[in-house]
Amino acid sequence: MLCVEIFDEEHEKDLQVNINNFLSELNENDVIDIKYSINAFTSSSGEQIYCYSAMIIYRIYK
């Protein structure tokens, strides 16, 4: 069965830590793909906000 896990953080280091923690629980042969995205925008108060996201596609066996 294919599954996905989605991560979304404001800091890239937090994203890295969370992804590495998740991947440490998987067999590396079960990871199909990792999609990565960065978005930046300005809030109504003028603050620059970054969004670092990743989606891991992986296989589990039942």
What are these regions (language model features)?
Residues M1-E10:
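Short amphipathic
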Residues E28-Y36, A40:
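Short, mixed-charge low-complexity intrinsically disordered segments
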Residues T42-E47:
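Short proline/glycine-enriched turn/loop segments at secondary-structure junctions
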Residues Q48-K62:
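C-terminal edge-of-domain segments
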Residues F22-E25:
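Conserved short hydrophobic interaction patches
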Residues L15:
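Surface-exposed ligand/attachment interfaces on beta-rich extracellular proteins
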